[in-house]
Amino acid sequence: MDTYPNQYIPKLILDYMSDELADSDFYKRLASTVKEKDVEEILRGISMDEEKHYKMLEKIYESITGQKANVTDFTPEELSDNIFLNLDKRVMEELNAVENYRSLMFALSEQWMRDYLTEIYTDEQNHAAKLSFLYSK
C-alpha cells in the first residue's frame, strides 16, 4: 500500500469511479435509442471503455488505500430527445475528463498507475473524437 501526502487522491478516485459508472450507463442508454447500427456500436464501445476505466481506477484505489472500493451509486444523466445535444455535451465532458485524469496521473508515483491513467485519458480523447465524428454525420 502506498501512502500519498495528498489525502484527497482516494476521494478523487472514488468520485471518478462514480463518474465512469454514470458515463457507461449514459452511453448504454443512448445506444439503445439510435437506429443506425454503426452509431449504436460506437456508443456501446464507449460504454464498455467506461466500465474498463472503472475497474482500472478500482485497482488503483485498492493499491493506495488497502481497502476495497465499493462504488455503486451514481446519478443517471438525463438523455435529451435530441441526439445532437447529447453528443455536444458529452464531447466537452470527455475532454474535461482528459484533464482530470492527466492531473491525477501526475500525482501518482507508481508507474503502473500512471500507465493505467495514460490509457484512460487516451480513451477519453478517442471518445471525444468519435462523438465529434457522430455529431458531424
Where are these regions (language model features)?
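Non-heme di-metal
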Residues: M1-K137
